[in-house]
Regions:
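Protein kinase-like catalytic core scaffold
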Residues: 159, 221, 279-284
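ATP-dependent carboxylate/phosphate-activation module, predominantly the ATP-grasp catalytic core
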Residues: 179-182, 200-263, 286-311
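A short glycine-rich, hydrophobically flanked beta-strand micro-motif that places a catalytic Asp/Glu
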Residues: 265-277
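ATP-binding N-terminal substructure of ATP-dependent carboxylate-amine bond-forming enzymes
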Residues: 1-113
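Peripheral (often C-terminal) accessory segments that flank ATP-dependent C-N-forming ligase machineries
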Residues: 308-381
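Short glycine-enriched loops at secondary-structure junctions
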Residues: 37-43, 92-94, 216-221, 226-229, ...
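Active-site nucleotide/adenylate-binding loops and adjacent lid/helix of ATP-dependent enzymes
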Residues: 120-197, 203, 216-218, 249-253
Length: 381
């Protein structure tokens, strides 16, 4: 057991959630037990993992930074060849570090970056990243960005509203499906962000994500898994999805060119909508590790450890192919399919859960987070 990857301490900073749990387990399965700085959230699922060398509980993003610098900032400052890895799982956490403490962070740690202060946060904005995708030939939905409260002329209903960035306004609570202008006006009064993106509503067949990382200022790329939802929920993600190795080389090349333009070094997730005619439409990039990387680990492509290797050596192996399998977010899938949508009975769901190759909370080799999940089931679903 070690707390380091090839002599570099590993630090994970994230809200208490199943996302950092995935990161910790990925490292742990390779004998690396990271430091975890957990920002209190719904339930302490990640900090219950056995794959932690030291755990710090904090109540805010600002406190997380204070702990990281006080306890570990001196390591890279004293010996730049031993800079710790600093890995993030939340947009707002990373954005705070990048906007408020970029120089200190980059001088002391190996971490996600695009070469200059605020550049990653800029491309978190949906308008900026969609324009970038369009420049590289990836289809995007026609969108308009307006000050919240302003109703644009000439749009065709139904439409959806979205916060312009994951670090402003209400983010997911700013999402509404509006069938007409009256509904749009009413929902505008509830939106918290100062600017809102309005897009045509597409009756989707599914959604898909590609989980990947880039290095060498975005020039090198590794795509570890593609996920497609097995059932759709209007205005919500599906917590049950197929997982397999990405096959669309042309799309991967275009994503790589986007990342090279941005200069991003880090783990990321690209999201797409798939319409009834199987056309794909680019939605956004999450410039962070997401739990959808869990099936990449299961398939033999652990993004976090391979990214660390690429950042040290400037190169990376080819992705390992694997047989497709289903991945489940247990609490949310139960709530949606059994309780709300009545798509299956509890015995049927339980059977599928037991057969599922990849789950977010349950891991027979690391059971305490599952015990915490069961004890806080209603909070986490």
């Amino acid at each position: 057991m070690s707390d380091s990857y090839k002599g570099h301490l590993v630090i994970v900073v994230a809200l208490e959630h199943y996302n950092p749990l995935v990161i910790l387990r990925t490292f742990g399965q390779e004998g690396i037990y990271p430091v975890y700085v957990g920002i209190n959230y719904k339930a302490p699922v990640a900090s219950a993992s056995k794959y932690i060398s030291a755990c710090h509980h904090v109540d805010s993003i600002e406190q997380s930074y204070e702990v990281v610098m006080r306890e570990y900032g001196h390591i890279g400052e004293q010996d730049p060849t031993k800079k710790p890895f600093l890995i993030f799982g939340d947009d707002d956490v990373y954005s705070y570090y990048e906007l408020d403490h970029y120089d200190e962070m980059m001088s002391r740690f190996i971490t996600f970056n695009a070469g200059e202060k605020g550049r990653v946060t800029h491309f978190m904005e949906k308008e900026a990243i969609q324009k970038c995708a369009a420049r590289h030939g990836i289809p995007t939905l026609k969108s308009v960005v307006v000050p919240t409260g302003q109703i644009p002329e000439g749009i065709v209903y139904p439409v959806v509203t979205k916060s312009i960035s994951p670090v402003t306004g209400g983010y997911k609570s700013d999402f509404f499906i509006c069938e007409n202008e009256e509904e749009l006006k009413n929902n505008m009064a509830l939106i918290k962000t100062e600017k809102v993106m309005i897009q045509p509503y597409v009756d989707k067949k599914t959604e898909m994500t590609i989980e990947a990382f880039t290095y060498n200022h975005g020039k090198g790329m590794f795509a570890g898994v593609e996920c497609r939802y097995l059932y759709t929920i209007k205005g919500y993600y599906s917590p049950l999805f197929d997982s397999y190795l990405p096959k669309d080389k042309e799309l991967l090349t275009k994503l790589n060119s986007m990342m090279e333009e941005i200069g991003f070094e880090g783990i990321w997730d690209a999201e797409f909508l798939v319409d009834k005619s199987d056309n794909i439409w680019f939605l956004e990039i999450n410039f962070r590790h997401t739990p959808w990387a869990n099936p990449a680990t299961r398939g033999g492509n652990p993004l976090v450890t391979l990214w660390c290797e690429a950042m040290l050596t400037g190169k990376c192996r080819e992705p390992q192919d694997f047989e497709p399998f289903a991945t489940m977010v247990e609490t949310v899938d139960y709530a949606k399919r059994v309780e709300e949508m009545k798509l299956c009975s509890f015995p049927q769901w339980l059977g599928e859960f037991k057969q599922c190759k990849c789950t977010m909370y349950y891991d027979e080799d690391d059971l305490e987070p599952w015990n915490v999940t069961v004890a806080n089931w209603d909070i986490l679903k």
